[in-house]
């Protein structure tokens, strides 16, 4: 009798350290601040609105800094629903619920984020969070479809290469070796400068194939 086949790769698709929510903010805060700084103020009415918005953001940021748990983070969202601190609070809620094993609540927080802030620089990361929760819950087909959605909707985001890598790794876990190899190859060629490309090259090496050469810049 042949020994039972062992998975090529075990464990979570991505280590949490690869997607720390603090890293999301650190990686994108310059873009967020640049967008805010690019707003041109014209007229008293706009200036008054901007002052109100600034005060709202400042108050929301203060409340966020004092938040100690999920209920207090939700209070930031409820009281200041259209502010950047509210977006930050929703991402923290999603992460906290995930860490507590509440995948449905975590996914609900991610989807709430996407509904409220569809153009936010972290929207791709929120959708990738949905995919990771689906994978953790065993809903593999939905996880793969959501990963594809990240790449399609947010191709320029930091989340896109991680989503493509995640899909390939799910295929690898399911012993779909050739499909996984094609997925890793795609990450290397389409996102050559990303950490996911280096991870994909490592997987290709383990599978006995060479990573494709990165395209010339």
Each language-model region and where it sits:
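N-terminal positive-inside, membrane-proximal cytosolic segments immediately preceding the first
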Residues: 1-38
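Short solvent-exposed coil/turn linkers within tandem alpha-helical repeat scaffolds
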Residues: 31, 79-86, 114-123, 151-160, ...
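Extracytoplasmic/periplasmic/luminal assembly and interaction segments
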Residues: 74-125
């Amino acid at each position: 009798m042949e020994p039972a086949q062992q998975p090529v790769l075990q464990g979570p698709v991505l280590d949490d350290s690869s997607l720390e929510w603090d890293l999301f903010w650190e990686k994108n805060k310059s873009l967020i601040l640049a967008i805010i700084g690019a707003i041109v103020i014209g007229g008293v009415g706009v200036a008054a609105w901007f002052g109100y918005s600034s005060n709202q953001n400042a108050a929301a940021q203060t409340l966020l800094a004092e938040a100690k748990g999920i209920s207090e983070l939700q209070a930031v969202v409820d009281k200041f629903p259209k502010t950047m601190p509210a977006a930050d609070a929703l991402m923290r809620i999603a992460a906290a619920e995930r860490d507590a094993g509440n995948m449905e609540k975590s996914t609900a927080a991610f989807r709430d984020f996407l509904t409220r802030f569809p153009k936010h620089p972290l929207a791709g990361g929120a959708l990738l969070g949905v995919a990771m929760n689906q994978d953790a819950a065993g809903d593999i087909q939905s996880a793969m479809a959501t990963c594809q959605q990240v790449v399609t909707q947010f191709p320029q985001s930091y989340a896109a290469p991680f989503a493509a890598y995640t899909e390939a790794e799910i295929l690898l876990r399911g012993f779909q070796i050739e499909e996984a190899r094609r997925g890793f190859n795609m990450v290397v060629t389409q996102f050559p400068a990303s950490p996911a490309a280096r991870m994909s090259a490592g997987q290709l090496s383990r599978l006995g194939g060479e990573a494709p050469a990165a395209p010339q810049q």
